Regions:
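Active-site neighborhoods and metal-handling regions in enzymes and metal-associated proteins
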Residues: 1-254
Length: 254
């Protein structure tokens, strides 16, 4: 989506604010013993409270309010009724529909203090997406963003999932352009003022090969290595991108 109307921009901002507030409330109840399914049920309750719809239920028969991925599940995790344990990595990918506008964003936390490798993984994943966000300015291309994400992952000894990509967003969940977490500088789609994109990256302690569970959704690392995912909704601007789902100062330990 390219924003051309002030009304659309206002609705999009409101949607992002509500979406972040719901994710914040989910974050605040993550602890040992809580199940991803309980978190997903709470997400649905909060959507009803705010008068919004869970966006992911609009996608291809998906029946949950969120995607919750734990440890080696990198993305699209089905919320399971399995209690979280100390040291687990949990990613909550979440979005809403508010007055016809969609949101989509994600954060990863460690349940309690992470081990040294997972702390490095968390930092690399967050930096990868933060670095890409800084490149979301007019005149750059999607390959500039992808280059930043993959470079940061590999610099730390990790890889990215290439099967799943960021995307445009607005009046539908997935729009052009695709924003891969890999690429070369100066390649891909040109970024223009007012373009709204989701910049996401799954950084994995693995080869980057994907295994899909029998549930048809949960995407795991092939070797069982852990994974993290971070995602922001961003408006492309001339000098400095605007992060709509501004969770950049959040911590990664709960």
């Amino acid at each position: 989506m390219i924003i051309t109307k002030p009304k659309d921009e206002r609705i999009l901002r409101d949607a992002a604010e509500i979406s972040v507030d719901i994710l914040r409330q989910l974050r605040d109840v993550i602890k040992e013993g809580v199940t991803p399914l309980e978190l997903d049920i709470l997400a649905g309750t909060l959507c009803s409270k705010y008068g919004v719809e869970p966006a992911f239920k609009s996608v291809g028969g998906y029946k949950y309010n969120s995607c919750i991925s734990v440890n080696d599940v990198a993305v699209h995790g089905i919320p399971k009724d399995i209690p979280l344990k100390k040291g687990d990595l949990i990613s909550i990918d979440f979005g809403i529909i508010h007055k016809g506008m969609f949101t989509d964003h994600c954060w990863t936390w460690s349940v309690g203090a992470p081990n040294a490798k997972n702390e490095k993984l968390l930092l690399a994943g967050k930096r990868a997406v933060d670095n890409a966000v800084n490149k979301a300015i007019v005149g750059n291309k999607t390959g500039d963003l992808g280059y930043e994400m993959e470079s940061e992952a590999k610099r730390n000894g990790f890889n990215v999932f290439r099967m799943f990509v960021g995307h445009g967003i607005g009046k539908s969940m997935h729009q052009a352009p695709e924003v891969p977490a890999y690429g070369s500088k100066g390649s891909g789609y040109l970024l223009v003022d007012g373009m709204v994109i989701c910049i996401e990256c799954q950084v994995v302690d693995d080869s980057g090969q994907v295994v899909i569970d029998n549930d048809g959704w949960s995407a795991r690392t092939q070797s069982g290595g852990d994974s993290v995912m971070f995602e922001y909704m961003v408006i492309v601007r001339d000098d400095q991108p605007e992060v709509l789902t501004d969770t950049q100062d959040w911590g990664y330990v709960v």
